[in-house]
């Protein structure tokens, strides 16, 4: 006798693995680099995206509510995490630069803007490698 039940809906294709905070941040930084924001002179938007992405990465990686903190408050909180002091200082300096452009009208040279994006990506790489090294040492 044929079965009258509908096929089970629980047999779904597996969902792709979630992207790591490191990969997600680096992907956003690549998108910013590929955007035409600098060519269009949209420095405020360029720096807004850098700052937002870096804060989001820090929040996900280190469990710190980075979006709700000033750079100096963030530096104090990061000192209590596994992030190195050097990386924390670099993150704070980059976020301060972002705020200077967004809110104080600072207009950096194109080379400086490109370097700031590279600095944000380097912070992600440094903290990613440092965290991986801690796991393998233990």
Protein language model features and the residues they cover:
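Short, charged amphipathic alpha-helical segments flanked by flexible coils
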Residues: 42-97
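Non-catalytic alpha-helical coupling and interface elements of nucleotide-dependent molecular machines
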Residues: 34, 55, 59, 125-129
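Alpha-helix initiation and N-capping motif
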Residues: 22-25, 71, 88, 117
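Generic structural signal for well-ordered, non-membrane alpha-helices
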Residues: 23-30, 52, 56, 76, ...
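Cytosol-/stroma-facing membrane-proximal "stalk/adaptor" domains immediately downstream
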Residues: 80-138
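Hydrophobic, helix-length membrane anchors
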Residues: 1-45, 128-138
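Generic detection of long, well-ordered alpha-helical segments
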Residues: 40, 44-48, 110-117
